Amino acid sequence: MTVHEAIRQSMRPSERRRNILKRLTQEPFASVQELQTLVGASEATIRRDLKRLAEDGALKRVHGGVERPEAQTSRLTGAPFSKSLHIRTPQKRAIAKAAAALVENGETIVIDGGSTTYMLCPFLAELDLQVLTNSLPIIDKLLASPRTRLLVPGGEVFREQNIILSPFDEDGTAECYASKMFMGAQALTSAGLLQADSILIRAERRLMERAEKLVVLVDSSKFSRRAGLVLCPLGEIDIVVTDSGIGAQDRAMLEGAGVKVVIADV
């Protein structure tokens, strides 16, 4: 056995999967046999890795191998950021202001990309903060605040949503610890917090693991939506900040799951 073969056979699962995905950034298709040679693993091991990556939406399994999903490499589902920014703007701004009141000076926080979370920025300008965010507009906005230290994950830029997402397990955020994560949602239902895309869900799960508490910012229209993929059950949410349009049944649903509800003044 050569030194290179020994190194390949000692790869951890995360390293194998990272190399598989890296190969798919270079070529649109890779056979199982090619990937076996690439990472020095058995066919059974490779197929387990491919099954996991396919379930996460990072690749598409086809006859004889895998290919990168074209829809994923070009765009995400859902309204572009520039359009979302101008929908229910008064409610989003009020929700962001109420959510910003939960932030304490000196904290490390995570802000997930989105039109409502973007509106947090002006309310945080006077605080000493360390902020981990995957949002290019949030990065741009907070760059003007010298009191904010910015951390950014590695990955690919999705231009319509203006966010950075990575299919890799190791995106540079593993050592970060935050007291709170602030994020929006496609919808909130009894099933939990829903988002539109599997790659978005995978990236957001990694960000959620970096934070002690999860704060969700949603306007009341999000409670009437039912489409999407479940990111997490309601029990994993600590606080929901919304507007007074939330119905009594939806509020009871959240509070029954142990979620604190904060109503913003619009």
List PLM regions with ranges:
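Glycine-rich N-terminal segment of FAD-binding domains in flavoprotein oxidoreductases
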Residues: 113-115
